[in-house]
């Protein structure tokens, strides 16, 4: 399958043949597992001190005194038990808890291939919430000169020429302050995802693009399901460079 390649001003440059990965079957179940696997891989096992709440001289006086048989200090205050001040926890976190979603290597690659193919389907991309009115084609491939852009203003000009600016505005307007404790824990804002830029190798465009609202930049070799299907939802609006398409040929 061939698609158009566009210059930085939005004009057509020519055609490029897409890798076979863009024809992969859509498997939302595999995509979800792969993304959850990537998310849970960041979790850290948690436990507590094995003697937490046990370090006390309190003891029970036994039955026959008309009071609960909990361990008590010399002053008569309850200790050791979960309902007592300074007592142990009833069900503390265990390091043995299984936190990670395991996935086979071939399944993970199949999920990535499926997510890449979904990013070329206008119905799936639109259903995810992206604004694609006026976008010349999906998948959207741009001239490799894009990777040499060093200014955010220049990148924004390319996005405007390719009609991607509407999706940037959607992401910018969608930034909201979260409710609850998240505000106190370094994740105050909910930030929608907009365009994913896939480049061939590390380049100037990486730093120039990532300051735009909702935009992420990744190299073709580092691309995974969590980038192209964030939140387990496939169909992210993606801008590919010519060199990124060539790298996909070698990866799949």
UniProtKB/Swiss-Prot annotation:
Keyword Protein biosynthesis in record: no
GO BP terms in the entry: translation
The keyword RNA-binding is assigned to this record: yes
GO molecular function, one term: rRNA binding
SUPFAM superfamilies referenced in this protein's UniProt entry, alphabetically: Ribosomal protein L4 (SSF52166)
Recorded GO CC terms: ribonucleoprotein complex; ribosome
Superkingdom of this protein's organism: Archaea
This protein's UniProt keywords: Ribonucleoprotein, Ribosomal protein, RNA-binding, rRNA-binding
Family: Belongs to the universal ribosomal protein uL4 family.
Subunit structure: Part of the 50S ribosomal subunit.
Function: One of the primary rRNA binding proteins, this protein initially binds near the 5'-end of the 23S rRNA. It is important during the early stages of 50S assembly. It makes multiple contacts with different domains of the 23S rRNA in the assembled 50S subunit and ribosome.
Name recorded for this polypeptide: Large ribosomal subunit protein uL4
Organism: Methanococcus maripaludis (strain C6 / ATCC BAA-1332)
Taxonomic classification: Archaea, Methanobacteriati, Methanobacteriota, Methanomada group, Methanococci
